[in-house]
């Protein structure tokens, strides 16, 4: 597991109070992990803070799964 992946899992476990085993790359933040719209906004804000990036709203709305979060962050951090 990459460092980015581990940080994403840790953030999701903390914010959504789910078991780490539930946070798979295929897990949908809303449908599988129970995040509501406010939870998702809080997750995005925490990803921005931890990874020191800005995630535009038009891009954030396309991020639905844990795998998409990791993929997006890896791409953005590689651009820095």
UniProtKB/Swiss-Prot annotation:
Q: Determine if Lipid metabolism is one of this entry's keywords.
A: yes
Compartments in which it is found = Cytoplasm
UniProt modified residues of type O-(pantetheine 4'-phosphoryl)serine: 37
One GO BP on record is: lipid A biosynthetic process
Named in its record, the pathway it takes part in is: Lipid metabolism; fatty acid biosynthesis
Query: What are the UniProt keywords, alphabetically?
Result: Cytoplasm, Fatty acid biosynthesis, Fatty acid metabolism, Lipid biosynthesis, Lipid metabolism, Phosphopantetheine, Phosphoprotein
Per the record, its GO cellular-component terms are: cytosol; membrane
InterPro entries, sorted: ACP, ACP-like_sf, PP-bd_ACP
Primary location? cytoplasm
Which Pfam families did the record assign? PP-binding
A GO molecular function term, named singly, is:
acyl binding
Q: Does the keyword Phosphoprotein apply?
A: yes
What's noted about post-translational modification? 4'-phosphopantetheine is transferred from CoA to a specific serine of apo-ACP by AcpS. This modification is essential for activity because fatty acids are bound in thioester linkage to the sulfhydryl of the prosthetic group.
Chain ranges of the Carrier domain: 2-77
- Functional description taken from the UniProt entry: Carrier of the growing fatty acid chain in fatty acid biosynthesis.
Sequence similarity: Belongs to the acyl carrier protein (ACP) family.
**Annotated NCBIfam families:** acyl_carrier, PRK00982.1-2, PRK00982.1-4, PRK00982.1-5
Query: What name does this protein carry?
Result: Acyl carrier protein
The coding gene here is: acpP
